[in-house]
């Protein structure tokens, strides 16, 4: 049975993936396509609704993104948001002007709640605006259904053609009625049922992988992270022992992480699981290297060599599992999967290793990947594992790497994670970790002078890692973490907490 589909047309706005996630929260499947995507291709996908996103351009600029008027003849409801609202109005004969006063942030708006778009929503609401242009009058046949102090045409509708536009951003949390408005569009205007669920996704994916793989062999480069673990589990459910997972333990993992991954996938789920202990090999290559980009390159290249050696031992392999998720697809503009000779997650596989790619998660956002993991019975602790960079602790130990520095960082990080979990903050904070900034400072311990390392703690709140704010961890939790690390981790006498947002800082220190 063909599933319901909403197309999100991307005009370059910062919230575009968030729009798609909001649609999927309503159990409606949607895909993001660039504004250059042809109307014929959109028609072929047979969407039940179309959403135009925001964007950074002005619609009256010569080089501003445009779209063919033919899209309105497909005959399905269309909703324009911010730039999308302005684009609908200018394309169909309305007028957009540059505003004297910019509307940015929380804005009061008056809505016509007799419109189906605003059904069940109060007349006077607050919303999130972010624009310097405004619609000064709507196209012929359109009715104004919303206005604000600086936007006389903050929302429009053409009931006959089922075309709607809003100047504000319903997808963000700062628009309290936004989820209800999107729900109205999906279920009352597009007449969708909401047939997208993780259980149906898993069933469909297992069936399609079985058909594609047949009796051939499959390998997966497993990192122990959420994406590769869930991807491997789906393929294992489909083809069983035809899948072999290769777990390269480079000695740069968090405390006990390698053992936990092996216990789950080899012992609990009975997978073909090869763990390669390559710690000495990696540390030798990283000796005296302090530049973070050089570290990344060395680790990536060595990973390829180890993976190649192990893969060749398995004989002829037809397929490679990759944990690509939907944001990767959107941000890189990837098309349909094809036979590849590179694997972007591990820096590129050797040219003589040809695999057909299996990307079971390429349609999913991160929260959906976690939901699939739970559906498949992967332990909750692994499904909610913290994001962890491919180079591991190599980029959380600033400067050159030694076994001593790695152990200090590993032990400090374990204490931090343990106390965050005890405080029931582990699923509300997006990412939290300890790093070693390669700073020594003077201290006093037991009436003696010390000259030891400093540990920096980093914890951030985010939804997508594109932007983040530092987490306001209760002082008593930070106090306990600090005292435990100083007392339990040899070689540390000072703890600092990073209170920088992204931007200007990145989440990781290197």
UniProtKB/Swiss-Prot annotation:
It catalyses: XMP + L-glutamine + ATP + H2O = GMP + L-glutamate + AMP + diphosphate + 2 H(+). ATP binds at residues 223-229. The active site is at residues 82, 169, 171. Residues 196-385 form the GMPS ATP-PPase domain. Its EC number is 6.3.5.2. One of its GO terms (molecular function) is GMP synthase activity. It is an enzyme of class 6 (ligase). HAMAP family: GMP_synthase. Catalyzes the synthesis of GMP from XMP. This is GMP synthase [glutamine-hydrolyzing]. It comes from Clostridium kluyveri (strain ATCC 8527 / DSM 555 / NBRC 12016 / NCIMB 10680 / K1). The lineage of its organism: Bacteria, Bacillati, Bacillota, Clostridia, Eubacteriales.
